Amino acid sequence: FVSSSSNVDNEIEVLRSKSLSGEVVNNLGLFVTYIDEDEFPKKELYQASPVLVSLTPQEADKLPGRMEVAMTLQPTGVMDVQMRVGEKEYRRQFEKLPAVFPTDEGTVAFFANNDTLFAVRPENVTKERHITAFINRPFSVAKGYANSLSIAPTSKTTSVVVISLKNTNPVSYTHL
């Protein structure tokens, strides 16, 4: 005989697990954050960056620290990239997207974000834009999400739980 409260406790432990958080972080790409450097104050661009930066979660987990990818989008379609990770720095200019940038830490790929609003797509940039992407270690991000998660049964006799997440970006947690 297994009580419903022990089943709920087991489910809560599964929901709190770092491995489940890791899958969510990897699948949603939450280990990459984008900042619009032209806004004051600077603004996070959750799912609204005109350019998406990609590094596999496996490569990102091996980073010695956070990778900073500063991008300057020109009205001509050219994009200048400056990357910094640890003591290393890389620079490259791309004439068009998609583009790839092999580094010692892995291959960083750049894509136009066709899901963004028409006005912020790379091909519609009318003035120079400055976007910075930060690639973090997915496991560290997953730990942060797991630690920010609050899961509790609604009562002692129910199998319904309330899940809440403390997050500074109200848009991003709606996808979790």
Residue ranges of model-derived segments:
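Structural beta->alpha junctions
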Residues: 154-171
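Conserved small/polar residues in nucleotide/adenosyl-binding loops
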Residues: 174-175
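Extracytoplasmic
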Residues: 1-156
